[in-house]
Amino acid sequence: MYDVTIVMTIGKVFRFQTDEESKPNEYQFRHENNQLFWIPVGDDGIYLNPMHIVSAEFRVINKQNN
């Protein structure tokens, strides 16, 4: 699971959590190939242009087994 923070050039910050293990790799691929990157926002989601992203952090959240 990842705690994701994306900062845009206009100062807008998006924070969300995802359990998709491929999300960091997908972000890197889309950034390198200048393709839109989908993120969840509210009940739906939006596409971000990687040229407008200042930084993206994917921090691993350790799951605790009960």
Feature locations, PLM:
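Acidic, aromatic-enriched beta-alpha/helix-loop junctions
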Residues: F29-D43
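N-terminal acidic leader/helix
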Residues: M1-E32
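A generic structural signal for beta-strand entry/edge sites
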Residues: M1-D3, L36, G45
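Short, mixed-charge low-complexity intrinsically disordered segments
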Residues: I39-N66
